[in-house]
């Protein structure tokens, strides 16, 4: 999944931010990875009622997963979105995922976003296919770039289908990776904790 790919660097980090958090997926999955929480740990499955799988097997595996978790990890996750309903949903999702005490979501505009030094920014900014307005998506990417350049020591991973993202953002990515968001071809634009070359006009 795109979320898991983008969160793969989190084990090194203690602070993750997302200025376009939506329902909180990126920050929540980053928290689960940092804490080494097994997928589905808090869920129940129909297969648990199968006669040919002893209940003790499920209990043993669930206990192993709990023992492997790193609940002492110093992780903090912060998400921001201009939509109050999305923020409310993100906070609810974090609680359901068992990371409500590690993730906080607030209503805020991207222009007011303040990247923290030494953090990693994971984000899936709105783009044409999702937003319905390519010009507005470009403006959001431009604002994100301006905000990020105020604190370029923060690493940033942006998932988008915008082929001109680098030009709108104002910086050439250190690395890119092609992925799919459902049926939409996208790329992860990676900006590491070091200066990167500006895009040539």
Please give the residue ranges for each predicted region.
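Single conserved hydrophobic/aromatic residue that forms the stacking wall/gate
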Residues: 1-7, 11
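Conserved class I S-adenosyl-L-methionine
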Residues: 13-20
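Positively charged, low-complexity nucleic-acid-binding target-recognition regions
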Residues: 14, 74, 195
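Hydrophobic "anchor" residues on beta-strands that sit immediately upstream
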Residues: 14, 25, 120
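A short acidic Gly-Thr/Ser loop motif
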Residues: 20-24, 182-183
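Glycine-rich SAM-binding Motif I of class I
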Residues: 24-28, 35
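Class I S-adenosyl-L-methionine
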Residues: 157-201
């Amino acid at each position: 999944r795109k979320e898991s790919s983008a969160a793969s660097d989190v084990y090194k980090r203690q602070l993750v931010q997302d200025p376009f958090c939506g329902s909180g997926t990126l920050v929540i999955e980053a928290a689960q990875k940092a804490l080494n929480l097994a997928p589905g740990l808090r869920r129940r499955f129909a297969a648990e009622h199968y006669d040919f799988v002893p209940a003790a097997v499920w209990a043993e595996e669930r206990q192993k997963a709990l023992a492997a978790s790193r609940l002492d990890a110093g992780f903090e996750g912060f998400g921001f979105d201009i939509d109050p309903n999305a923020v409310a949903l993100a906070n609810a999702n974090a609680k359901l995922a068992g990371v409500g005490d590690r993730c906080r979501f607030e209503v805020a505009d991207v222009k007011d976003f303040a990247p923290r030094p030494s953090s990693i920014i994971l984000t899936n900014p709105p783009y044409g296919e999702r937003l319905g307005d390519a010009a507005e998506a470009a403006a959001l990417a431009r604002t994100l770039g301006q905000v990020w350049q105020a604190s370029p020591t923060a690493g940033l991973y942006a998932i988008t289908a915008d082929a001109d993202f680098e030009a709108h953002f104002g910086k050439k990515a250190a690395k890119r990776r092609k992925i799919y968001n459902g049926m939409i071809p996208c790329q992860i634009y990676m900006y590491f904790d070091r200066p990167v070359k500006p895009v040539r006009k």
